[in-house]
């Protein structure tokens, strides 16, 4: 059997089948995404612009490793980064543990590959974990959980692990109190960890929940003083913010992203990045490492 080709030549059926198989194989190979521009984002911090500058040596190296331009998606909230990744506006970035779990539940294409191994810094212990802490202003009458009944509590963001999930789901059970909105007179969202701490320092809130490493960043930035606060409660260890990518990217791009972060400690510029983010290295992580967050959601 034969058929007429566009070039005007006859081809055998076998030749035609071989060509069709080649087309199918090529289509399969192209089913992954290979964007000319890679977009990076991260959940908002006390100073997202400054924190982005910390990532510059890493992103510069990634440009060399991929041959692609990299753009930054400026976040407005935790949820905005999640939605940007789900909508393919962002290809890789840094989420919070809770926002990662939310993103993963909406799409299996969101894949965690690493996190920070933090250096010891004040109340932040060394390792790839942190704790949620409940803070009040030292010298105030709020020196126990019982004394906070009927007061104003500041959280960070509904999609923040330490500023939303743990206070709402974990803390009431651990402290044996009613839900937050029943125990406190008012629950407010500060929008960022530093703003939650500052709201307590400036008497705009009576207490706040904040991540231990974010609290120390606020202290180190000179915005508040560690000695000005009581720590009334702290959670068990929770894994640090996950580095994620969309696994629909082509393998060479995914490998370049992962390798760039995992070898960041091998260069002088990378060492400066680690110093800025108060970390000793970047360590691999997997989805199951965040099951503790999923379990908290069930409470």
Model-found features: residue ranges?
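Bilobed "Venus flytrap"/periplasmic-binding protein-like clamshell domains
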Residues: 35, 39-65, 75, 98, ...
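Acidic, polar ligand-binding/catalytic clefts
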Residues: 83-147
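Boundary at the C-terminal end of the N-terminal hydrophobic targeting segment
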Residues: 25-31
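Bacterial N-terminal signal peptides that target proteins for export
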Residues: 2-15
